[in-house]
Amino acid sequence: MQQGWLSNWLVKHKVVHRSLGFDHRGIETLQIKAGDWDSIAVILYVYGYNYLRSQCAYDVAPGGSLASVYHLTRIQYGIDNPEEVCIKVFAQKDNPRIPSVFWIWRSADFQERESYDMVGISYDNHPRLKRILMPESWVGWPLRKDYITPNFYEIQDAH
């Protein structure tokens, strides 16, 4: 599989990762261990990836792992096509913990909270990690593949 500059740099510095290739737009995608994510995030920020374009999370498979996906952009003045990279950080379902990058990219605040609320990934050192869409009393993580929908019905007016 073809590797990009970031994957080659990580290999050179003996950082464990897995190259997942390139997407349809030519953006390199890497798989990173949760324990390495905070240091790699700092490296990316220092290199110039100063914008967290988006963050999301998904359930890989029932009984499997959860993934937190970060799309980072290197924005520079006068550059029409900024560099982008996609980082996937995987965590086991029984203890889904990933270091928060809120302290590096402030835009991770609500995005990591939404991932916590919907998928149940706990972002270590996030300053306000609590539910953002569901009520605090909600039980479970609605976007997990093993989620069981509560047995209740919405009452509607017949007007």
From Swiss-Prot:
Instruction: Name the UniProt key words of this record, in alphabetical order.
Output: Chloroplast, Membrane, NAD, NADP, Plastid, Plastoquinone, Quinone, Thylakoid, Translocase, Transport
Query: What top-tier enzyme class does this entry carry?
Result: translocase
Kindly state the subunit structure of this protein: NDH is composed of at least 16 different subunits, 5 of which are encoded in the nucleus.
Could you tell me which species this protein originates from?
A: Brachypodium distachyon (Purple false brome)
Topological category with respect to the lipid bilayer: Peripheral membrane protein
Q: Which GO terms describe its cellular component?
A: chloroplast thylakoid membrane
**NCBIfam families for this protein:** PRK12494.1 (NF009141)
**UniProt xrefs under Pfam families:** Complex1_30kDa (PF00329)
EC number(s) from the headed UniProt entry: 7.1.1.-
The cross-references to Gene3D superfamilies, in alphabetical order and at most eight, read:
NADH:ubiquinone oxidoreductase, 30kDa subunit (3.30.460.80)
Q: Which gene encodes it?
A: ndhJ
GO MF annotation terms: NADH dehydrogenase (ubiquinone) activity; quinone binding
Which family is it part of? Belongs to the complex I 30 kDa subunit family.
Q: Which reaction does it catalyse?
A: a plastoquinone + NADH + (n+1) H(+)(in) = a plastoquinol + NAD(+) + n H(+)(out); a plastoquinone + NADPH + (n+1) H(+)(in) = a plastoquinol + NADP(+) + n H(+)(out)
Q: So what does this one do?
A: NDH shuttles electrons from NAD(P)H:plastoquinone, via FMN and iron-sulfur (Fe-S) centers, to quinones in the photosynthetic chain and possibly in a chloroplast respiratory chain. The immediate electron acceptor for the enzyme in this species is believed to be plastoquinone. Couples the redox reaction to proton translocation, and thus conserves the redox energy in a proton gradient.
Q: What is this protein called?
A: NAD(P)H-quinone oxidoreductase subunit J, chloroplastic
